[in-house]
Amino acid sequence: MKNPLKNQRAAILGSLCLAGLILFSTNAQADAQAGAATFKTKCASCHGADGKGKAALKTQDMTSAAVQNMSDAELTAITTDGKGKMPAYGKSLKPDQIQDLVAYIRSLAKK
């Protein structure tokens, strides 16, 4: 019998490796302004226009230390694969759009 946890771990590890490759690619430059546009269309309905989350939905506050202390690879993996109630965006967003989104989330810490 196959071990489902082993498969899940392999999938997570693979996603993190892919995210790391994307983040450290020399050709890729994250653009927070482009990420803001993606956030507005894909994320704001749940996380709020200001990124501070919506209490009724119990969504993450993107400005919080808990989110800001996550690595770029973690944020990329969560955006790509989803987590909990958050859907996966790996099939609907391109890797550079996800990078831009992470850059925008980082900019929210300064607001």
Indicate where each model-derived feature is located.
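N-terminal export/targeting leaders of redox proteins
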Residues: 1-33, 111
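Periplasmic c-type cytochrome electron-transfer domains
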Residues: 2-14, 47-50, 69-74, 89-107
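Generic alpha-helical propensity signal that fires on short helical segments
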Residues: 19, 23, 80, 85, ...
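Ubiquitous "structural anchor" signal
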Residues: 19-23, 28, 43, 59-61, ...
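Periplasmic/extracellular electron-transfer cofactor-ligation site
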Residues: 32-60, 77, 81-87, 107-111
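Conserved protein-kinase N-lobe ATP-binding Lys motif
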Residues: 65
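Transmembrane alpha-helical core positions of polytopic small-molecule transporters
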Residues: 68-69, 82
